[in-house]
Amino acid sequence: MYDSTSKIKDLSLAPFGKLQMEISETEMPGLMTIREEYEKLKPLKGAKITGCLHMTIETALLMETLQKLGAKLRWCSCNIYSTLDYAAAAVSTLENVSVFAWRGETLEEYWWCVEKALTWGENGEGPDLIVDDGADASYLVHKGAEYEKLYEEKKILPDPETGKNEEERCFLSLIKSSILKNPKKWTNMSKKIIGMSEETTTGVLRVKKIEKNNGLLFTAINVNDSVTKQKYDNIYGCRHSLPDGLMRATDFMISGKIVVICGYGDVGKGCASAMKGLGARVYVTEVDPICAIQAVMEGFNVVTLEEIVEKGDFFVTCTGNVDIIKLEHLLKMKNNAVVGNIGHFDDEIQIADLFSHEGIEIENVKPQVDRVTLPNGNKIIVLAQGRLLNLACATGHPAFVMSFSFCNQVFAQLELWENRNTGKYEKNKSYILPKELDEKVAYYHLKKLNATLTELDDNQCEFLGVSKNGPFKSEAYRY
């Protein structure tokens, strides 16, 4: 039954969304197995979960799984362009599920949606748990509480005009407005949140930064660093969705072209592999000597951006850092060069500086594709204004690989909820899931691919010092 408090684009899209969910179920064997094992037990009964994660069909199936396990949900997307409106419509019809997401939100609307997903009552009551992607929901709670303390002690309100970009100004404006309405909302909310589980590399960096400064207000489980997330979603997911996004956006031939991949972490590895497989000449930029030598050993040229910027046909950032492709680089690119980002946030490329630069002409070609005429007359193609091109220009990672990631999210939520009173997890620390669960997630997906495990005999188990049922590797093993 549709929750009238939801805010979505078009409820009439729900039947199509439900059909897509039904089709994708067969491609998400892990989530379906979790449902079979846990649905009758309702282990999440009573849990209020806020989600801030791309509102796709795969996410809809994650939400439905959490709901079937007993949870109540309030959900928003973590990117203004990544929502599939038919997915939002379909999942909003589930009992005890509210959705605040639509494709093409403004930044002001985006943060409104995040606040709505976090707010469970008229007096500002919050969730028990958070499913996060990029840590935006958790960040809002932390910064809100921080500014409330400043207001309580010194009567200083956040000044939106001090924001370094439009998004930060919207963010500060929301917190200012919130404090004037309820000066203890985020502080009170943070005290009741049991914990959060974080999906991405970028979000983990954000959480670690808060933790390092002794500012973590509730437990965090780092889902990204589970092997069955990091090595599958980040590598194989990007290997599938990057070329999908590039081809849908441009229809340009990739074979024979020069593709520059900025960053050779797990995401970069998947991107470079995909481009190589399509016949591109791949160049990699890196700061880490370990990642750089890995790229060279795979046959890629490792260069600086300055060396290749005037020659590249496609540029893709995937570093999790800021200001990777600067304005000075953009202005030097050749005619019809394509620029996009597959890292979580939009500040890897200085798009705002480009769009406001004197002499620039911007022409929208189609949704999330802009052609920018540079002062020298060259035209470059900018994808998704520097946001996630695989989700903005296509539909993101395939369902099968997301089944791995979302199994880890479900297990993280179960761990937090079931151990809320045991003391297993400290409130101001971050954790990763135990290896037993990592192996369990992998095991769930073997049957779908007709793979059969070899079983160790007793002598082999004794020699290795492991159980027949695992875990089979030490915590230090890097796969």
Swiss-Prot record:
This is Adenosylhomocysteinase. GO terms for cellular component: cytosol. Keywords: Hydrolase, NAD, One-carbon metabolism. Binds 1 NAD(+) per subunit. The keyword NAD applies. Pfam families: AdoHcyase, AdoHcyase_NAD. One of its GO terms (biological process) is one-carbon metabolic process. Its EC number is 3.13.2.1.
